[in-house]
Amino acid sequence: MSNNSRHYSAIDEAILQGQAMLETLFGKPVAQRENPAKGLSQPALTSAEKKQSIGFMRVNHSGEVCAQALYHGQMATAKNPAVRALFTTAAKEETDHLAWCQERLEELGGHTSYLNAFWYTNSFLIGLLAGLSGDPLSLGFVEETEKQVEIHLADHLRKIPSNDLKSRKIVEYMQQDEIQHGLNARSSGAKELPYLVKKLMAFHAKVMTTLAYWI
């Protein structure tokens, strides 16, 4: 029986979610796909350029921490096995993003956000609430989240130094994946979220991106 269709007890689910949190926050993520920046010849960056790139890649890494938490929260409460499978697949692809961002941060000499445990906990609870609202709204939450993430990534591509080829290549690949995740959610029956919920999501994202850039 596949993991997607297997029934877990509440204790099993809690153990699985705890393991996922620890792996995300303290483990070294392993990508299933090759880093798109691998093999690129990277020109030298000035100190100012490197500092700027570190800030944006730290934000992107924290965004992927949030994505892991959101998807795991939604997986834990999904009613339809097909919806749970969709979340599981998306979470695996987001793990690739997490690994790529972490690898690039290390190359740049930067650190991940010191607030990642807070981001994860907060996002996991949001994912649980989204899932408990029913699969259509949970899928709508994914669609809206990915729309907002794609906008953030497009903004980063305008601001990351033009000669930071590796960071830009990673962000470009991430952007395409996020667009596809949103389309997948829509085609699976996503229900549009209320306007106020969208605004609250944007505010939450603004707080995270602002703080993670520096801390």
UniProtKB/Swiss-Prot annotation:
Q: Which residues bind Fe cation 2?
A: E94, E146, E178, H181
Q: Which CDD domains match?
A: DMQH (cd01042)
List ligand-binding residues for Fe cation 1: E64, E94, H97, E178
EC number(s): the record gives 1.14.99.60
What GO cellular-component annotations does this UniProt entry give? Answer: plasma membrane
Q: In which pathway does it act?
A: Cofactor biosynthesis; ubiquinone biosynthesis
Q: Name one GO biological process term.
A: ubiquinone biosynthetic process
A single GO molecular-function term is:
3-demethoxyubiquinol 3-hydroxylase activity
Cofactor: how bound: Binds 2 iron ions per subunit.
User: What role does this protein play?
Assistant: Catalyzes the hydroxylation of 2-nonaprenyl-3-methyl-6-methoxy-1,4-benzoquinol during ubiquinone biosynthesis.
Which family is it part of? Answer: Belongs to the COQ7 family.
Q: What is this protein called?
A: 3-demethoxyubiquinol 3-hydroxylase
Q: What is the originating organism of this protein?
A: Coxiella burnetii (strain CbuG_Q212) (Coxiella burnetii (strain Q212))
